[in-house]
Amino acid sequence: MDSQPRLLLVHGSVVNAELTWNAQQPLAERFEIVAPNRRGFPPGPDVERVDFEDEAAWLEQFLEPGTHLVGHSYGGVISLLAAARRPELLRSLTVIEPPAFGVARGVPAADEFIARIEEHWTSGTRDPAEFLRGFLALVGSTTPTGNFTPELLQGARTLMVERSPAEAVIPFDELASAPLPKLVVSGGHSAAFDAVCDVLEERLGAERAVLPGAGHSVQRLGEPFNELVTSFVECAETS
């Protein structure tokens, strides 16, 4: 029996792999799913600093020949960097609203968003719960009602020590020349995220998809997202 295509799912900020990719469980019927928890997220301990470059190096341990890499949000930035480091190990690359806002500087919506995020980090509250509420409102994610769980509060503390993804230098030349299909997905809710995704589409020669209805966390749509990824990965397998 042939082995199943291998999907490596890289989560973003605030919540771990299990919560980020819960709606992708049905994909396990078609694919081998690898979804590691990044450092600083439950059930692991807190960390003092999160840096996307260091995370890209850490992610390499999970790359194997033929991997289909899928990254959401901060995990999308990590995935872009990891793909440029080891393109020979990848069969395809999918990123979902990576906050690499530096690539869209000069676009008013992106510039305004960068300013608001930087203000939140430098001048905002240091209370993890309130910091998280403000962050979720900024990026277009649903804010849970009531008190935050200990797991979410840990995610908030990790969020507070993240290096700004707007500082990421995306290696466009390496990625564009890599002979693998690329897909950029957005949720159609934010002009700032759309600006980033539009630049990535153009500079990487990527396919582009917009799936509205779940804000920043497009994968939480479940079936529509899963069908998109399934079609893209199966096409990549035969290309």
Question: What kind of region is each of these model predictions?
Answer:
Residues 1-45:
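Conserved HGGG/HGGXW glycine-rich cap/lid loop of the alpha/beta-hydrolase fold
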Residues 32-68:
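Active-site loop/oxyanion-hole signature of alpha/beta-hydrolase fold enzymes
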Residues 69-71, 96:
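Short beta-strand immediately N-terminal to the catalytic nucleophile in serine-hydrolase-like folds
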Residues 71-75, 79:
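Gly/Ala-rich beta-loop-alpha elbow adjacent to hydrolase catalytic centers
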Residues 147-213:
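Conserved serine/cysteine hydrolase catalytic core
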Residues 211-226:
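Catalytic histidine-centered segment of alpha/beta-hydrolase-like enzymes
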